[in-house]
Amino acid sequence: MQTIYTKITDIKGNLITVEAEGASLGELVQIERADGRSSYASVLRFDARKVTLQVFGGTSGLSTGDKVIFLGRPMEVIYGDSLLGRRFNGTGKPIDHEDECFGEPIPITTPSFNPVCRIVPREMVRTNIPMIDMFNCLVKSQKIPIFSSSGENHNALLMRIAAQTDADIVIIGGMGLTFVDYNFFVEESQRLGFADKCVKFIHKAVDAPVECVLIPDMALACAERFALEQQKNVLVLLTDMTAFADALKEIAITMDQIPANRGYPGSLYSDLAVRYEKAVDIAQGGSITLISVTTMPGDDITHPVPDNTGFITEGQFYLKDNRIDPFGSLSRLKQLVIGKKTREDHGDLANALIRLYADSRKSAERMSMGFKLSNWDKKLLAFSELFEARLMSLEVNIPLEEALDIGWKILSQSFHSEEVGIKEQLIQKYWPKACLHK
């Protein structure tokens, strides 16, 4: 039996307080307004009989005498094949002007996958982006963010990864998107040809922050069901997790919580971790690979959001100057696939290229300070130009094997074979024959 309450004692921002009994955290609530409209809310906090609710869609037009009905179940989202190709807002309602979506309602707040049923990641996810495939391999079921400096086109990188991987289903969770960003996701997924296997959960910048915090939960709840019940390999793309954290901060301030670092709630680490831990490779088949975007305000890597994220995830891609910076990027799972799922020369070649590129940066610094350059410095500078143009540029779109071959060609055009520090047996097998004795 549902109990109806009509005594709203406080309205503050998107939060209301009502006197009620028997409420549970996360419980879904229906609010019936005097003008006949209805909206939903969820239980955020309770203290004795005072229950705080976060209202989806805002509290505009709400009065203290409106009916509040506790539904006895958590927030749910529709799951099923009918989701594919569709777009939904932060409350799970379609926003693509198509028919109502039908399927199985599932709760959006579920525990992380049972560790006993997880398996060690072992499959490489190919993106055809050399700075990922060659130097920081993406592994199936990995959770990894893209740390993006201001002004970087991280959304284009996300869509390119989505189009060029072999994921069965792509789920995009957009938070705090401008109309331009939202339109880009819609049009780009159609242009790249994966719109029919893509589900989009979208929170726009003009929407209530309460809806923003639901986006990752809805995206990951659906991904978990697709992976578990249909054995699908699901790629989840979340952008922007800084907007997600800002929404948490706004809600916490409205609730008069004591802030922690830079105004963010003390639960920020846990709030991020519980979402990232949904990434999984399931023993019975199916997987969830999670790539997020975390913008860094003021390019500050010590900002609470990227700082906490770095302790949770399995590496990061550092997007800077329209390139993936090799020195700020890391994949903690790459050793599981390099040389095991890729060519034998992969590890040695990648290490040599990065080592020489690091040396070239020192030579460039000496040149900028007016020091006289040695012949070795000149070789390094010539090498860095080739390396940046043929492997680092995000315009490059080639398979891993071709990237490895190009890496050998760049080395042979810049150095003698004995100068690169690679094992002789690999030199004999892969060094371009025309340059073998150079």
Curated annotation (Swiss-Prot):
Gene3D superfamilies: 3.40.50.12240. CDD domains: ATP-synt_V_A-type_beta_N, V_A-ATPase_B. InterPro entries: ATP-synt_VA_C, ATPase_F1/V1/A1_a/bsu_N, ATPase_F1/V1/A1_a/bsu_nucl-bd, P-loop_NTPase, V-ATPase_su_B/beta. Pfam families: ATP-synt_ab (PF00006), ATP-synt_ab_N (PF02874), ATP-synt_VA_C (PF22919). Keywords: ATP synthesis, Hydrogen ion transport, Ion transport, Transport. SUPFAM superfamilies: P-loop containing nucleoside triphosphate hydrolases. One of its GO terms (molecular function) is proton-transporting ATP synthase activity, rotational mechanism. One of its GO terms (biological process) is proton motive force-driven plasma membrane ATP synthesis. Belongs to the ATPase alpha/beta chains family. Produces ATP from ADP in the presence of a proton gradient across the membrane. The V-type beta chain is a regulatory subunit. This is V-type ATP synthase beta chain. It comes from Chlamydia trachomatis serovar L2 (strain ATCC VR-902B / DSM 19102 / 434/Bu). The gene is atpB.
